Amino acid sequence: MPGMEYSTVSKIYGPLMIVEGVKGVAYGEVVEIETESGEKRKGQVLEARENLAIVQVFEGTRDLDIKTTRVRFTGETLKVPVSMDMLGRIFNGIGKPIDGGPEIIPEDRRDVHGAPLNPVARAYPRDFIQTGISAIDGMNTLVRGQKLPIFSGSGLPHNMLAAQIARQAKVLGEEEQFAVVFAAMGITYEEANFFKKSFEETGAIERAVLFLNLADDPAIERIITPRMALTVAEYLAFDYDMQVLVILTDMTNYAEALREISAAREEVPGRRGYPGYMYTDLATIYERAGRVRGKKGSITQMPILTMPDDDITHPIPDLTGYITEGQIVLSRELHRKGIYPPIDVLPSLSRLMKDGIGKGRTREDHPQLSQQLYAAYAEGRSLRDLVAVVGEEALSETDRKYLKFADRFEREFVAQRYDEDRSIFETLDLGWELLAELPESELKRVRKEYILKYHPKYRKRGS
């Protein structure tokens, strides 16, 4: 029953404790735990049956004693205090300030699990979000209200890319306020300092809310961190009409925490030991992106995950791909070449790109230009494989131009500086500069009128 206090803890293992002899306890209920020394911790009911409750302890179960620990069930779900004053602040994984600033005086308290959106109330994601990164803006465009994950690998610069996107992202031609909610799970102190420094030195912190769960924090916190971030994002988007970009890194650490808790509960494991409900659990996070009819605000998600052994068929990227609307794939081969960001545009995809580009959104030539760049780069890549077998001497003059185009595409279009913020028009013009490498007769995916208007040969003649 709400408010009842129990000292009937029968077992503690991993991040979990079992409390017996309880009555009226509900799933998801917040629990207050007090040690013999008076230290207080919080937890949440994971399972309630008959007279028994399984509780996950957010701050971990270290130093908890079965005989002296007291547990009080509050009768409430986990809520996060929300306020506009959270912009510019840094919090830990469970929402406590870690930037030396004061506690937040809440305007409201919201359930971390959010309110489910009626599918009929959803508005279709449209409108281009400029990240300033050519490989994304030009080839795999991010659309307002979309969920577009970044598939990375261990040692690849996804943290730099996340910080760059958070710093540069904007909605063109809009007066609406833009905000970034950044949630990091299971990161090292070095990574946490990098994100803090990156946001503070560039001034991006002023429009951002940061949640940082460190690697030595209890794994259970990682389950709460993305939900805290999304609850704040929903508040900013739907109460204050802001355009909110939510960046979640690293979802692999989140899934590992999910597996750890599942193993502690002795649940039947699914693929590679992950719980069978991982798809549903990930969906409760990813599906909180979107737009709502009658509301000006939006939530756009960019979850980042590191693929174990660079395996895109691993359960985490595999299930993520089913729920989200595309993927940005980072390439170890491009990284070895010294190309940043090492985005491989061929396996990358933005399923909603077609609805966020073109006349009135980016530029009229954007859809056909991106298709032509994609086709030309794919041809150049396949010719590289051929050259490895037969040598470059066997290639025709046109084939050599495709080969040169592929090299320039990687060095000039994909590659850019960490502090380089390219406009969409600079990106598109750069694409045309590269296509000028090829014979005009090879540009079969672009209308003649666009060639005459944007091709460097005619553009310079016209000017």
Curated annotation (Swiss-Prot):
Coiled-coil features, chain-numbered ranges: none
Designated name of the protein: A-type ATP synthase subunit B
HAMAP family given in the database record: ATP_synth_B_arch (MF_00310)
Family of this protein: Belongs to the ATPase alpha/beta chains family.
One Pfam short name: ATP-synt_VA_C
GO terms, biological process: proton motive force-driven plasma membrane ATP synthesis
InterPro entries: ATP-synt_VA_C (IPR055190), ATPase_a/bsu_AS (IPR020003), ATPase_A1-cplx_bsu (IPR005724), ATPase_F1/V1/A1_a/bsu_N (IPR004100), ATPase_F1/V1/A1_a/bsu_nucl-bd (IPR000194), P-loop_NTPase (IPR027417), V-ATPase_su_B/beta (IPR022879)
Known partners and oligomeric status: Has multiple subunits with at least A(3), B(3), C, D, E, F, H, I and proteolipid K(x).
Database matches in PANTHER family: V-TYPE PROTON ATPASE SUBUNIT B
GO molecular function per UniProt: ATP binding; proton-transporting ATP synthase activity, rotational mechanism
The protein's role, per its UniProt record: Component of the A-type ATP synthase that produces ATP from ADP in the presence of a proton gradient across the membrane. The B chain is a regulatory subunit.
Localization per Swiss-Prot or TrEMBL: Cell membrane
One GO CC term, this protein: proton-transporting two-sector ATPase complex, catalytic domain
UniProt keyword annotations, A-Z: ATP synthesis, Cell membrane, Hydrogen ion transport, Ion transport, Membrane, Transport
Membrane topology recorded in Swiss-Prot or TrEMBL: Peripheral membrane protein
Signal sequence coordinates: none
